[in-house]
């Protein structure tokens, strides 16, 4: 069963699961993810759909962001939103749960 341990070690995202000192827990969902990118560097696919509860697209063209919620609202169900990002970014969505 040694191969299971090797698989665990080879996962880069396992190394960022621990809380870093001085890190804001509210931002853990995205900022500690290896797939996280800054808002300005994101280039969403043209067919990206907002989650069902976030229908107001932000003026900078990121449809999964709404005016009254952070970008996490479409990544996590804990915020009360359905999290439709799982269709487009399954890895990011899985990380958020």
From Swiss-Prot:
Protein name: Putative uncharacterized protein H1-10-AS1
Spans annotated as Disordered: 1-45
Organism of origin: Homo sapiens (Human)
Polar residues: bias regions: 28-41
Highest taxon listed in the record's lineage: Eukaryota
């Amino acid at each position: 069963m040694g191969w299971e341990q090797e698989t665990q070690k080879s996962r880069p995202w396992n190394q960022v699961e621990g809380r870093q000192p001085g890190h804001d827990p509210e931002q853990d969902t995205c900022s500690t993810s290896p797939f996280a990118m800054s808002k300005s560097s994101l280039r969403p696919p043209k067919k990206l759909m907002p989650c069902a509860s976030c229908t107001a697209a932000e003026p900078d063209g990121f449809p999964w962001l709404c005016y009254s919620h952070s970008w996490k609202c479409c990544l996590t169900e804990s915020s009360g939103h359905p999290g439709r990002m799982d269709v487009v970014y399954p890895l990011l969505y899985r990380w958020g749960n």
